[in-house]
Amino acid sequence: MPNWKKVAVSGSNVNFNQITSSGDMLFQDSILSYQTNTDIDTGTEVVATIDGSAYKAAFFDYVAVSASVNIRAGSIMVAHDGTNTTQAEASTQDLGNTAGIKFSSSIDGSNNFRLSAAVSSNNWSVKTVVRGI
């Protein structure tokens, strides 16, 4: 069976059923990135990082899971000025209890824009799709 490939030509209309990427996807001055930390233990750990010198805002779409029964999905919107971050979160209601996880954002010394999770018990998993603009 032949394996046909579509070629996108400037000015043409191409319909792709699926695009698979093993890395980040760049769209002009924006980025789409899948990042995960699947073993967050008691304390604070980085979940996702994005280049703060390239992007002033990021949207972290996430699912947080503990013990397979404590689940929350949401989106954390973060903006920064190079020194400070501000964030807002919209999320689903808990399935089980996700009170044991709190998210925070920061800028590190290399101007990386970070989303961190502070957890009160071991074995949390957070998967994110990060949109940087």
Predicted regions and their residues:
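Beta-rich globular "head" domains
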Residues: 46-82
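Trimeric beta-solenoid/beta-helix "fiber body" segments of extracellular/virion adhesins
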Residues: 21, 29-30, 66-68, 80-82, ...
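Low-complexity intrinsically disordered segments
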Residues: 93-133
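Intrinsic low-complexity, repeat-rich intrinsically disordered segments enriched
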Residues: 1-46, 51-54
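Broad, structure-driven detector of short, well-ordered beta-strand segments within folded domains
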Residues: 7, 17, 72-80, 103-107
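Residue-level recognition of well-ordered beta-strand positions that form the cores
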Residues: 26, 61-63, 77, 116-118, ...
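Terminal beta-strand-rich extracellular "head" domains
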Residues: 77-100
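Short, surface-exposed beta-strand/loop "edge" segments at domain boundaries and coil↔beta transitions
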Residues: 14-15, 66-72, 119-127
